[in-house]
Amino acid sequence: YSTIINNNYNLYSQFEHKPCSDDEYDENIGFYWIKTLIEHIFGDQVELGIKYLKILYDNPKQALPILVLISEERSTGKTTFVDFLNIMFGANMVIINPQDISNGFNGSYADKNIIAIEESRFDSIQATEKLKNLATQKEILVNSKHIRQYSIPFYGKLIITSNDETKFSKVDSPEIRYWVRKVPTLKGKGNHQILSDVRKEIPQFLYYLNTLPEVDITKSRMVFEADEIATAELQTVKNESRSGLH
């Protein structure tokens, strides 16, 4: 890690956590709770979920789809997953609310690598378009209160959680920027101290990510092909958007 790169200040923050050493890695103990959480969130797409996390870790400049975790039920682990990422990525991530996207000020998230928007529903066309633009834009005009505007490269990846399973946002049929997953309830699998446990497991998990093959990031602008991340939940949202009932 270096704070200065090519005479420019590095806006990416140093990680609090480091991969464990070869001697410290124990595949029998490993990262049980992190693995359990990832499998719960991504379900039958868990391999894609691991690739997604590896890219977040290895290639912070790479654009990725907007990950949307939906469920109208309680105790699903959506917030726990966001909190886990926040622990892992530290100051490179921010958790905001939908109003922060809708208003004109973006200083809280413009320089972040991961932008999580919790319990979200975006009713206005303006907010929906802003989301889509953020997913692919390469530069952002930073607008903070009482500070002169300035431009910086933008590498933000969006994660949305919502309890609205069908109308969290308007999504047109041709849209390929969303990866929508319905998250089931934990059904007795809960661990009230899971955040403490996953924090301890992060060095083992980072070691594991480093052992995985490099992900091919050249096959699509957002790495994953549309059919790879297509889900029934995404199609339902598109159908609702097309019906005019949004």
Labelled PLM ranges:
Residues S2-I114, S120, W179-R181, L209:
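P-loop NTPase catalytic core of nucleic-acid-dependent motor ATPases
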Residues I70, D216-H246:
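DNA transaction DNA-binding modules
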Residues A110-N113, Q137, F154-K157, S173-W179:
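Short glycine-/polar-rich loops that comprise or flank the Walker A/P-loop
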Residues E119-R121, K138, D164-E165:
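Conserved Walker B
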Residues D123-T128, K170-V171:
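Conserved ATPase-coupling elements of RecA-like P-loop NTPase cores
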Residues T128-Y150:
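Conserved catalytic/switch belt of AAA+ P-loop NTPases
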Residues S169-K189:
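A short helix-turn-beta junction within AAA+ P-loop NTPase domains corresponding to the substrate/partner-engaging
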